[in-house]
Amino acid sequence: FLKRYDIEPKYEELADYLLKPIRKKIPLDLLRCYFYYCAPWMSPEPTDSEKKRMEEHEHLMEHLEGIERWAVRLGKLQRRWDGYKEYFEQKRVDVLLSVDMVRHSAAGHIQHAIVLAGDSDFIPAIEAAKESGATVSLWYGEDNSIHKDLLNLADITHKIDIRKMPGKKVKKDESK
């Protein structure tokens, strides 16, 4: 989401940014922030560009794992073909998020889940978390980036104000 706006987030401040409006109404402690992602594609004989992307990925993962109360969950990047066009798709990431949310809410580890997503694939997990007694806050970007059923299902919704998001604007690399 933030790549669209050329924002490099300050992950250390992200949890407080997301919790702030909720904490105005109820006291809320942070169990953990989970970051769901996957490593970039690497061909059998990686190009310099692929090696650079992997190095950046490893640096980010190391940074996130070093932040107190943060955990990284990695899926896999799968190479696919649509006719003659190659594309890449993240696999397992949505399932990992869903399993963690349902597991923690069912076990009573969390009373409030904060989700940054827009995909309707999360609807069953959010329903299960709510049935377990958790309140679900949904943060989303542009209106067209979120499924309306997901928006209607969440207990609380917040539209991300990119101007207040902790982070800094990065310059686009025109050579890419």
Model-derived segments and spans:
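Nuclease catalytic cores that cleave nucleic-acid phosphodiester bonds
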Residues: G66-K176
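Domain-level signal for Mg2+-assisted phosphodiester chemistry and nucleotide/NA-binding surfaces
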Residues: F1-E89, T135, G141
